[in-house]
Amino acid sequence: MALTKQTARKSTGGKAPRKQLATKATRKSAPSTGGVKKPHRYRPGTVALREIRRYQKSTELLIRKLPFQRLVREIAQDFKTDLRFQSAAIGALQEASEAYLVGLFEDTNLCAIHAKRVTIMPKDIQLARRIRGERA
């Protein structure tokens, strides 16, 4: 986000600062004895942008192998029982699935940007799929 220059404005009056009570002044000036330091937090969006750059650079699979394998076996169970899979077959399915999902999210992001938003919503996914011709 670009920094904007702030111009000085003439004051139009207002309330004069009141004198602080003695107890308030001593409370403010006394150092805190707790010494508990707040954990460092990045500004909203900083970590998200860092993750975007990290995942765009990388080529590794993003979905864990075993949960994906269980999902494939569960879906295949509906069509035929006692199916066996080569590990290369599940690897190929995972590569194709992740490539499809990444492409769908790219198109979904474009739909959100077109609607002047930065947050993707289910309606963006539906629009992206409809434009692709996957769902009428």
Curated annotation (Swiss-Prot):
The modification N6,N6,N6-trimethyllysine is found at residues 5, 10, 28, 37, 57, 80. This is Histone H3.3C. Belongs to the histone H3 family. The modification N6-methyllysine is found at residues 5, 10, 19, 24, 28, 37-38, 57, 65, 80, 123. It is found in: Nucleus; Chromosome. The modification N6-succinyllysine is found at residues 15, 57, 80, 123. GO terms for biological process: chromatin organization. The keyword Membrane does not apply. The lineage of its organism: Eukaryota, Metazoa, Chordata, Craniata, Vertebrata. It comes from Mus musculus (Mouse).
